[in-house]
Amino acid sequence: MGVPLHEQGDWIREVADLGYTDVWSSEADGADGFTPLALASVWAPSLRLGSAIVPAFTRGPATMAQCVAALADAAPGRVAFGIGTSSNVIVERWNDIPFEQPYQRTRDMVRFLRAAVAGAKVRETYETFTVDGFKLSQ
């Protein structure tokens, strides 16, 4: 078990003071991939923030766009967003979501996120999902 999130502030500040430039978060069986980065954005405003890796399956497209946009808004110019297929264990066994067409799902999510984060109102049928009229309010 790692350090609880509420106890990581001093550690994150020390990492920045020691000259590290980045902190990265993953998503598997602990905290989600975004919350630790949001906290780090406040605790150490000089650090770049990265997700390595957020699963393309475990959030719907609109929710994923909201998470990415919120973190980018909290830490302008400091976010590297990593997304990937994850695994059948995390997707199917832990989240009860069919782990089908993982490459296509990731590709479709990236295409959707590019449009949504750029401010487009997305009405699109992708190979693995459909979005009908989502627009981030920024």
Question: Which residues make up each language-model segment?
Answer:
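N-terminal beta1-alpha1-beta2 module of alpha/beta enzyme domains
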Residues: 1-52, 57
